[in-house]
């Protein structure tokens, strides 16, 4: 559990804290974290996967709070679920290919505005309830 929390929760926070100042000084001013819909408490309708789910719920909270801490830095902080992707983890029955996920995410990230900071989105840009 500890290793998963380090990877999925603590590492994104350390990366965000390390690069926030440089990102805010740059042209894009966007910091995006890839989470999972499995980290949504309101979307959770089944048991299992406790370690993964809790680590993604934790990174959602961490990045939501980080977005509040960086409001004065002109930095857009957003969280995305990449979709159910055909990968080793998602399996062959998943809904979309990695290419489809990335193409959609790139468009959504490009379209982010200051009004989106601190929000949680699906790969297609629709908001996800916490």
Model segments located where?
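A short local structural element in Rossmann-fold oxidoreductases
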Residues: 43, 89-91
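Acidic/histidine-enriched, beta-strand-rich ligand/metal-binding domains
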Residues: 50, 80-81
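Catalytic loop of short-chain dehydrogenase/reductase
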Residues: 1-6, 10-14, 20-71
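C-terminal helical subdomain
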Residues: 72, 79-80, 91-130
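Active-site loop/turn elements of alpha/beta-hydrolase fold enzymes
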Residues: 34-36, 82, 123
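Short, flexible catalytic-loop segment of classical short-chain dehydrogenase/reductase
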Residues: 82-88
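Flexible, glycine-rich phosphate/dinucleotide-binding loops
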Residues: 40, 86, 127-129
């Amino acid at each position: 559990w500890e290793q998963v929390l380090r990877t999925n929760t603590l590492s994104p926070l350390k990366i965000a804290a390390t690069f926030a100042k440089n990102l805010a000084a740059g042209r894009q001013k966007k910091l995006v974290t890839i989470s999972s819909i499995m980290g949504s408490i309101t979307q959770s309708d089944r048991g299992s996967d406790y370690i993964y789910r809790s680590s993604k719920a934790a990174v959602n909270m961490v990045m939501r709070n980080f977005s509040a801490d960086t409001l004065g830095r002109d930095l857009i902080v957003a969280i995305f679920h990449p979709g159910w992707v055909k990968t080793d983890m998602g399996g062959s029955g998943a809904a979309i290919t990695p290419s489809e996920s990335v193409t959609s995410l790139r468009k959504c990230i490009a379209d982010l505005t200051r009004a989106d900071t601190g929000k949680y989105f699906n790969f297609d840009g629709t908001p996800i309830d916490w």
